[in-house]
Curated annotation (Swiss-Prot):
Residues 2-182 form the KARI N-terminal Rossmann domain. GO terms for cellular component: cytosol. Its cofactor is Mg(2+). This is Ketol-acid reductoisomerase (NADP(+)). Substrate binds at S252. Keywords: Amino-acid biosynthesis, Branched-chain amino acid biosynthesis, Magnesium, Metal-binding, NADP, Oxidoreductase. It comes from Dictyoglomus turgidum (strain DSM 6724 / Z-1310). Mg(2+) 1 binds at D191, E195. Residues 183-328 form the KARI C-terminal knotted domain. Belongs to the ketol-acid reductoisomerase family. Involved in the biosynthesis of branched-chain amino acids (BCAA). Catalyzes an alkyl-migration followed by a ketol-acid reduction of (S)-2-acetolactate (S2AL) to yield (R)-2,3-dihydroxy-isovalerate. In the isomerase reaction, S2AL is rearranged via a Mg-dependent methyl migration to produce 3-hydroxy-3-methyl-2-ketobutyrate (HMKB). In the reductase reaction, this 2-ketoacid undergoes a metal-dependent reduction by NADPH to yield (R)-2,3-dihydroxy-isovalerate. Binds 2 magnesium ions per subunit.
């Protein structure tokens, strides 16, 4: 089992008298910046001058600088902008101003693991990846709690990088819940696999396939939507709360029997073979190369596939049905 580090085992000492720059002030950036500040760490927010993030950070009492200025003043730099934007920002606004003994931090390992960012050898490089959205990271911190996180050290020039990573995790409240040590390779590959095969790709493909099967068999699209999409949250919430066995205790015996006898016919050995193929594409770097190239040519496949799914019947039906559910606060 992985070693879990808790609040009492970790000190903020490694960040004492250091300046931490948070690059980005979106969902995660704002949460990290505010939590670190409230933990007594000196924080600079680095964003595009006079944009919405700049204005919001100022309104919330943060010290705000242009990225290139903040880099020169800081000891620790945390990248909390989208993965696709990081390499250009790093090359143009960070790399020219780096100095020995600084630390680069990331919340996801993609750009380091797939060499889109290659840091000079005189830096520490670490990762702290909260396992929850930014607003939750902030809200739980304010309540005296925390969101669990992963941490990793990629490059330890000062021989203090591990302490810096753990101190950072403590500063955002993660050690209150517990942090697990991993590697950039493990975090990146498992994160991509989970997104593609289960959490996003797998779930959405399963929902659409079930919906289409019922509609093609003559059932009303509205009923198919309820059975294949809307009720998904009920089951996922139970699994999230207590695991698969806990969920099964909360459903009918009929549902339970159908689950354990029919589920394996849907996700079978052929499905797992395809899962292993996708994992290999991630491990070999094939997916990363494909996604990087897709961005370089303007995302034609990405945009076309998104548009196709946005025009799917399930979206049209869902929009109508969600208007009947005011508690969902339907959004465009």
């Amino acid at each position: 089992m992985a070693k879990v580090y808790h609040d009492t085992e970790v000190s903020l000492e490694a960040l004492k008298d250091k300046i931490v720059t948070i690059i980005g002030y979106g969902s995660q950036g704002r949460a990290h910046a505010l939590n670190l500040r409230d933990s007594g760490i000196k924080v600079i927010v680095a964003v595009r001058p006079n944009g919405e993030s700049w204005k919001r950070a100022l309104e919330e009492g943060m010290t705000v600088e242009k990225i290139e200025d903040a880099v020169q003043k800081s000891d620790v730099l945390m990248f909390l902008i989208p993965d696709t934007e990081q390499p250009t920002i790093y090359k143009e606004k960070v790399l020219p101003y780096l100095r020995p003994n600084q630390a680069l931090g990331f919340a996801h390992g993609f750009n380091i693991h797939f060499s889109q960012i290659v840091p000079p050898p005189f830096l520490d490089v670490f990762m702290v990846a909260p396992k929850g959205p930014g607003p939750l990271v902030r809200d739980l911190y304010v309540e005296g709690k925390g969101v669990p996180a992963l941490f990793a050290v990629y490059q330890d020039y000062t021989q203090k990088c591990r302490d810096i990573a753990l101190a950072y995790a403590k500063g955002i409240g993660a050690t209150r819940a517990g942090v697990l040590e991993t590697t950039f390779k493990e975090e990146t590959e498992t994160d991509l696999f989970g997104e593609q095969v289960v959490l996003c790709g797998g779930v959405t493909a399963l929902i659409k396939a079930g919906f289409e099967t019922l509609v093609e068999a003559g059932y009303q699209p509205e009923v198919a939507y309820y059975e294949c999409l809307h009720e998904m949250k009920l089951i996922v919430d139970l699994i999230n709360q207590g695991g698969i066995s806990f969920m099964r205790k909360a459903i009918s015996d009929t549902a339970k029997y159908g689950d354990i006898t029919r589920g394996p016919r849907i996700v079978n050995e052929e499905t797992k073979k395809e899962m292993r193929k996708i994992l290999n594409e991630i491990q070999s770097g094939q997916f990363a190369k494909e996604w990087i190239l897709e961005n370089q040519v303007g995302r034609p496949v990405f945009n076309a596939l998104l548009k196709k799914d946005e025009d799917h019947l399930i979206e049209k039906v869902g929009k109508v049905l969600r208007e009947m559910m005011p508690w969902l606060k339907p959004k465009k």
